[in-house]
Swiss-Prot record:
Name of the molecule in the record: Uncharacterized protein AF_2234
InterPro entries per record: Uncharacterised_AF2234 (IPR020075)
Domain of life: Archaea
Organism the protein comes from: Archaeoglobus fulgidus (strain ATCC 49558 / DSM 4304 / JCM 9628 / NBRC 100126 / VC-16)
One Pfam family of this chain: DUF2769
Amino acid sequence: MERVDELVERECICRDCSTYVAEESKTGFCYFGTSEVIKDEKGCLCPLCKVAAVMELKGEFYCTRGS
C-alpha cells in the first residue's frame, strides 16, 4: 500500500486552489495540518482532491480549518 505522504506529494492539488497563496511553501493540509500563512478563504478544491478522497475526508478548507 502506498504511503500517504507519497500520495500527497504526487496528487495534492492545493497549489491550484484560489485560496492558496504564493507565500506558502507547504501543501497537503488535509494530511499535514493547517497553514500558518493562509488566512483568507477564497474557494476550495478539497472536495475534488484525490488525497482527501483516499483519506475519506468530506470537509473543505483544510488549509485554514484543519481536518
